């Protein structure tokens, strides 16, 4: 070839290479040209199951790739990265047939914590309007999710790297999938697992500890839509598992119906977004916890205080997961929800022939929290657990009020004002092994219905 013919072609080739980086890494998949989102459904859309798998990765954290699970190598041609852990999000029953408002916040919260594959299982078509039909679809859905996970494993993912996060009915779908894998998946998190049709179901039909190497569940609506029985290695009962603070009154009917139930989801999102720990305390019941009978991270079933979130096994050593454990914690009305817990105690100098009720309030830099404790008849000690939004050392003041006794007052008889004398002590949880509490330096005299204010100066 003559030099004058070669030069223009070489120049053209160089320009082409500059403008078109020929297959810039053959295995690299760019941001999808089309972003897929949830299907929409309605009460008139029927109950036929139609499942979409939406993939989000560090390469496309805001843009869902629709994976056709029936197409050979569809996952392999996507942005899926088998070297990363995989979070599989499964929603539950839908009344309206629209995308859950919590879906995007949960996806983004996961990406802020770690590089991960996020797969959203959209079964809006098949979960809308008719709850019983949605329940009937669970086994079929579980089989499809199982087949999808097997494709991930074929690409090199490990069973232990799979974490299913299921909300309401989605928690039991996760249980069905985990059962198909013989409990070898890494983790299943149930966000207020659904109650109806599952409370009396067999372990194979619902979420249970045998479904994964670690199963945790968050209970927030156990007196309504959420299941009350423990279903995991660790079960968190938030504010006793029902009646969440900040949820609206029955006047706002729809929000009233779903607020407690969805609080588990928003608590989980908050645990990923905020550093303050949502720590649970092992105890036999919420009543025993609030009464101040479970002050440390030790019980017959558990020797740790697990935390909601992505911490491995909730921070619990593997050897402690041989039996199911229930843990309890209180929260605030809004994100980040986390509170500090302290035990408060009043010790009477002299026992009384009637029960004694004392309101104890903490005043911090901004907010105020209070509880009422009871000293039983002929007893001398009353205690309880009080939640507060700042550490105990930042609580400036304690206010104690002796509550009035109920009595019938005769018109011809004078009424004597009641008074007691005793000692006030407190300690932030978990309590120290020494059992030593901080006590005010002097005894207090409380007069009925008269608030007594005292500075509270504990060390940070």
Predicted ranges, named:
Residues 2-120, 127-137, 147-155, 159, ...:
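Flexible, membrane-associating and regulatory peripheral segments of lipid-active enzymes
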Residues 91, 164-177:
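Glycine-rich nucleophile elbow surrounding the catalytic serine of serine-hydrolase chemistry
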Residues 125-127, 195:
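Alpha/beta-hydrolase active-site loop signature
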């Amino acid at each position: 070839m003559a030099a004058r013919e070669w030069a223009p072609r070489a120049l053209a080739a160089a320009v082409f290479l500059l403008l078109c980086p020929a297959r810039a890494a053959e295995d690299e998949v760019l941001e999808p040209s089309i972003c897929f989102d949830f299907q929409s459904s309605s009460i008139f859309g029927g109950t036929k199951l139609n499942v979409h798998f939406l993939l989000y990765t560090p390469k496309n954290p805001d843009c869902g790739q629709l994976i056709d699970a029936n197409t050979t190598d569809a996952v392999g041609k996507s942005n899926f990265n088998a070297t990363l852990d995989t979070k599989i999000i499964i929603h539950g029953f839908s009344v309206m047939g629209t995308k859950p408002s919590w879906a995007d916040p949960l996806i983004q919260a996961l990406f802020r914590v770690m590089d991960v594959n996020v797969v959203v299982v959209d079964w809006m078509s098949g979960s809308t309007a008719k709850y019983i039909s949605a329940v009937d679809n669970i086994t079929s859905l579980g089989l499809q999710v199982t087949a999808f996970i097997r494709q991930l494993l074929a690409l090199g993912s490990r069973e232990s790297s799979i974490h299913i996060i299921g909300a309401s009915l989605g928690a039991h779908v996760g249980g069905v999938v985990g059962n198909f894998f013989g409990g070898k998946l890494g983790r299943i998190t149930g966000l207020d697992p659904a109650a109806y049709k599952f409370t009396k179901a067999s372990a194979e039909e619902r979420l249970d500890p045998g479904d994964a190497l670690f199963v945790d569940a968050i209970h927030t609506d156990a007196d309504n839509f959420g299941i009350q029985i423990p279903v995991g290695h660790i079960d968190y009962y938030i504010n006793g598992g029902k009646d969440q603070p900040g949820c609206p009154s029955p006047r706002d009917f729809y929000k009233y119906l779903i607020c407690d139930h969805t609080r588990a989801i928003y608590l989980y999102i908050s645990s990923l977004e905020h550093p303050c720990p949502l720590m649970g305390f092992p105890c036999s019941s919420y009543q025993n916890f609030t009464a101040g009978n479970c002050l440390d991270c030790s019980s017959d079933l558990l020797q740790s205080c697990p935390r909601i979130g992505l911490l491995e096994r909730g921070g619990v050593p593997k050897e402690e997961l041989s039996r199911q454990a229930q843990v309890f914690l209180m929260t605030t009305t809004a994100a980040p929800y986390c509170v500090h817990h302290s035990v408060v105690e009043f010790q009477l100098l002299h026992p009384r022939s009637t029960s004694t009720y004392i309101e104890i309030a903490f005043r911090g830099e901004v907010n105020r929290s209070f509880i009422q404790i009871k000293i039983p008849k002929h007893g001398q000690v009353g205690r309880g657990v009080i939640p507060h939004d700042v550490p105990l050392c930042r609580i400036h003041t304690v206010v104690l009020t002796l509550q009035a006794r109920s009595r019938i007052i005769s018109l011809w008889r004078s009424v004597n004002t009641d008074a007691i004398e005793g000692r006030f002590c407190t300690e932030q949880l978990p309590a120290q092994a020494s059992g030593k509490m901080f006590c005010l330096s002097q005894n207090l005299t409380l007069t009925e219905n008269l608030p007594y204010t005292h500075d509270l100066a504990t060390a940070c």
